[in-house]
């Protein structure tokens, strides 16, 4: 029985690792200016940041880069009722404002859909930013509202999938849970918690029955 549980767990970890390409960056929602910008450890690695904006708000992210580096960032919107026309602005700014690249979404709404199998979530695609870093330095990504809208978005940075050194037994469950909270899918959380309790109860019941038969 233990071997079966282990094999099932390994298959789940392998399949979810293949489906989930981004490493999540958690935060406390305090990155609201350049001084408190959320640090992106390595802009080449594929990261995802779940975030939200109020009307006329902005969120700030920062990273270090070298001249000639390729940089990628994009925004997607979770397919939630009320966000069909939501499209915040994406701005890349160099330290001391020596470099600035502003990208707005200019296609139709609600936008092209894509399904993310790990979190079982559908997103609407928005704008992408691809550029070459002009010189060594500190850079900022600013996601801001310019349309008097509020909503949720996922900011993706980098394109290299790298989970080396990560504990997948803790990383994947946390990432799944964060995704469900992000899209307000509390039903899936309750179901998963119920399944977890049921699985934990199986060995307990087996031990209880074994002791009972001995008596």
Task: Give the positions of each predicted feature.
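Bacterial N-terminal signal peptides
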Residues: 7-15
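C-terminal edge strands of extracellular/lumenal beta-sandwich accessory domains
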Residues: 22-33, 61, 82, 87-99, ...
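Positively charged n-region of N-terminal signal peptides that target proteins for export
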Residues: 1-4
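Non-catalytic, beta-strand-enriched accessory regions in extracellular/secretory proteins
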Residues: 40-66, 70, 75-79, 89
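Extended, solvent-exposed segments with strong compositional bias
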Residues: 105-132
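Sec/Tat signal peptide C-region and signal peptidase I cleavage site
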Residues: 16-21
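Low-complexity, Ser/Thr/Pro-rich intrinsically disordered linker/stalk segments at domain junctions
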Residues: 37-38, 44, 128-129
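A surface-exposed loop-and-adjacent beta-strand signature within N-terminal beta-sandwich domains
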Residues: 29-36, 50-51, 97-115
């Amino acid at each position: 029985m233990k071997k079966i549980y282990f094999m099932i767990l390994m298959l789940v970890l392998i399949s979810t690792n293949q489906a989930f390409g981004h490493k999540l960056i958690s935060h406390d929602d305090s990155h609201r200016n350049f001084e408190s910008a959320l640090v992106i450890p390595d802009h080449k690695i594929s990261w995802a940041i779940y975030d939200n904006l109020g009307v006329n708000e902005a969120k700030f992210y920062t990273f270090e880069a070298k001249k000639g580096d390729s940089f990628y960032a994009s925004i997607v919107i979770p397919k939630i009722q009320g966000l069909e026309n939501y499209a915040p602005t994406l701005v890349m700014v160099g330290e001391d404002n020596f470099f600035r690249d502003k990208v707005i979404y200019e296609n139709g709404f609600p936008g092209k859909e894509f399904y993310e199998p790990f979190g079982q979530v559908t997103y609407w695609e928005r704008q992408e930013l691809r550029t070459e870093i002009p010189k060594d330095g500190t850079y900022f990504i600013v996601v801001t509202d310019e349309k008097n809208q509020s909503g949720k978005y996922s900011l993706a940075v980098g394109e290299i999938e790298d989970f080396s050194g990560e504990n997948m037994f803790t990383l994947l469950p946390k990432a799944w849970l964060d995704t469900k909270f992000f899209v307000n899918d509390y039903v899936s959380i309750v179901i998963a918690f119920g399944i977890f309790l049921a699985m934990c109860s199986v060995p307990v019941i087996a031990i209880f029955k074994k002791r009972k038969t001995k008596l």
